[in-house]
UniProtKB/Swiss-Prot annotation:
Transmembrane segments: none annotated. This is Peptide chain release factor 3. Signal peptide: none annotated. Increases the formation of ribosomal termination complexes and stimulates activities of RF-1 and RF-2. It binds guanine nucleotides and has strong preference for UGA stop codons. It may interact directly with the ribosome. The stimulation of RF-1 and RF-2 is significantly reduced by GTP and GDP, but not by GMP. GO terms for biological process: regulation of translational termination. It is found in: Cytoplasm. Its main location: cytoplasm. The gene is prfC. One of its GO terms (cellular component) is cytosol. Residues 9-278 form the tr-type G domain. Keywords: Cytoplasm, GTP-binding, Nucleotide-binding, Protein biosynthesis. One of its GO terms (molecular function) is translation release factor activity, codon nonspecific. Belongs to the TRAFAC class translation factor GTPase superfamily. Classic translation factor GTPase family. PrfC subfamily.
Length: 527
């Protein structure tokens, strides 16, 4: 069999990043509508209503209306096969979001045009910078009153340090929103309100000086558009493919996801410009997506996607080669060969068995506790993909049982939740406490809720005197033993049995680092 490169070349794997409430879940819905994956987009407002958004499928997400877990959706568009990784938009889930960004080749950044660049967007952009991920920008919510579009572009350039190349330009906003003008095509696309849940035929006016444009949008707005475009074309950047691929320049589209307008414009841009599946760095070499032999890495573990079965699914990004049903793969970390006959493809919680998958695709492996985040699978070669870190948590709570006899179930539940990256667990060496660490407060609620629904364990969390944690290592065995002996009250094991220093205050941590210069205190740890 010759390896069909055209299959790899038509893949586009991307994630959507945004500040909470910038409209990311709505955009996900509309993208799937264009990809024919769903026929009527389930509106995301009306959190108690029956039409839940397709990508928010865990019980707690349905109640709260926030995307907590990463879903994967695949759909055809133009001549490409697009893999969309939906990431948690809520500020409390940055670690899961971070790891998802290790599995994509490009990102769509969604900005609320009334608010501009917000804090979470800044953090996520820092993460994409680590791998110079190409970014496409969608200025959303044009059906509301927005900030001046030139101001928005300036803010993106100054705050996020990336050049902007406007591809479309808005005509009015809020109640006066009339559509967008496409700079490269010299065409105006006219907006009709109330068309959000299905794909409509859009009226197109050719040419900027076409009198038809004045009739369609009104003389004032038509003239304003011409004036603004003169400024834009003088002051902004032209699109350059090379700068985009390097993560230095972002093409900018305007629209309203709720009104289902402008979404197809950035999808056209994504399929035309975004990179095909890229090579990946492993510990021994770089693996190219065009290689024939299979390789992939696990970036997320999701528990209980099927409430009827107490199962876990490991999400794996295929880096090279082709997955075929029933193939034998090497699980590198444990050195064992496994036959994978039941890998899954996804449509957010709806699963189908994968017959085949290529570089760029995401497949799900059934996991009975043997697979961890960061694991590499190959067709025999011993290598490990790098760059999938664990972060030291910023918040800590002690978990306490309502029924002390359920200690065993509690520990099992917490270890499983920590393996899938929902939370980190620490067991102090000197007592039986169970301390959980997270990047945001909401994760603690998620853990208590999932312990109850999935493990039948009633638990509560309470404050604990821990300010921060660091993984510790030392090359000098004798000095490490002395460090462990003198600091036993501050040492714990994490879910993977790695030794961790838990500090009651930052001052305490700084003192420990000064006292023991041979001990390395790590803020992140490779999975």
């Amino acid at each position: 069999m010759s390896y069909p490169l055209e299959e790899v070349n038509k893949r586009r794997t991307f994630a959507i990043i945004s500040h909470p409430d910038a409209g990311k879940t709505t955009i996900t819905e509309k993208v799937l509508l264009y990809g024919n994956a769903i026929q009527t987009a389930g509106s995301v407002k009306g959190k108690g209503s029956a039409a839940h958004a397709k990508s928010d499928w865990m019980e707690m997400e349905k109640q709260r209306g926030i995307s907590i877990t990463t879903s994967v959706m695949q759909f055809p568009y133009n001549d490409c096969l697009v893999n969309l990784l939906d990431t948690p938009g809520h500020e409390d889930f940055s670690e899961d979001t971070y790891r998802t960004l290790t599995a994509v080749d490009s990102c769509l950044m969604v900005i609320d045009s009334a608010k501009g660049v917000e804090e979470r967007t800044i953090k996520l952009m820092e993460v994409t910078r680590l791998r110079d991920t190409p970014i496409i920008t969608f200025m959303n919510k044009l059906d509301r009153d927005i900030r001046d579009p030139m101001e928005l572009l300036d803010e993106v350039e100054n705050v996020l340090k990336i050049r902007c190349a406007p591809i479309t330009w808005p005509i009015g906003c809020g109640k006066l929103f009339k559509g967008v003008y496409h700079l490269a095509k010299d065409e105006t696309y006219l907006y009709q309100s109330g068309q959000g849940s299905t794909i409509q035929a859009v009226r197109v006016v050719k040419g900027l000086n076409n009198p038809e444009l004045d009739v369609a949008v009104g003389d004032d707005l038509a003239q304003q558009l011409r004036d603004e475009l003169e400024l834009v074309q003088g002051a902004s950047n032209e699109f350059e493919q090379d700068a985009f691929i390097k993560g230095e320049l972002t093409p900018v589209f305007f629209g309203t996801a709720l009104g289902n307008f402008g979404v197809d414009h950035f999808l056209d841009g994504l399929t035309q410009w975004a990179p095909k599946p890229q090579s990946r760095q492993a510990d021994t070499r770089t693996v190219e997506s065009a290689e024939e032999k299979f390789s992939g890495f696990v970036f997320k573990i999701q528990a209980n996607m099927d409430p009827k079965h107490r199962d876990r699914v490991a999400f794996m990004r295929v880096v090279s080669g082709k997955y075929e049903k029933g193939m034998k793969l090497k699980h590198v970390r444990i050195g064992k060969d496994v036959v994978i006959s039941d890998a899954l493809t996804f449509m957010a919680g709806d699963r189908a068995h994968a017959e085949e998958a290529y570089a760029g695709d995401i497949i799900g492996l059934h996991n009975h506790g043997t697979i961890q985040i960061g694991d590499t699978f190959t067709q025999g070669e011993t290598l490990k993909f790098t760059g999938i870190p664990n972060f030291a948590p910023e918040l800590f709570r002690r978990i306490r049982l309502k029924d002390p006899l359920k200690q065993k179930q509690l520990l099992k539940g917490l270890v499983q939740l920590s393996e899938e990256g929902a939370v980190q667990v620490f067991r102090p060496l000197l007592n039986n406490d169970l301390i959980v660490g997270a990047v945001g407060v909401l994760q603690f609620d998620v853990v208590v809720s999932r312990l109850k629904t999935e493990y039948n364990v009633e638990a509560i969390y309470e404050n604990v005197n821990v300010a921060t944690a660091r993984w510790v290592e030392c090359a000098d065995g004798k000095k490490f033993e002395e460090f462990k002996r003198k600091n036993e009250q501050n040492l714990a094991l994490d879910g993977g049995d790695n030794l961790t220093y838990i500090a009651p205050t930052m001052v305490n941590l700084n003192l420990a680092q000064e006292r023991y210069p041979d001990v390395v205190f790590y803020k992140t740890r490779e999975h």
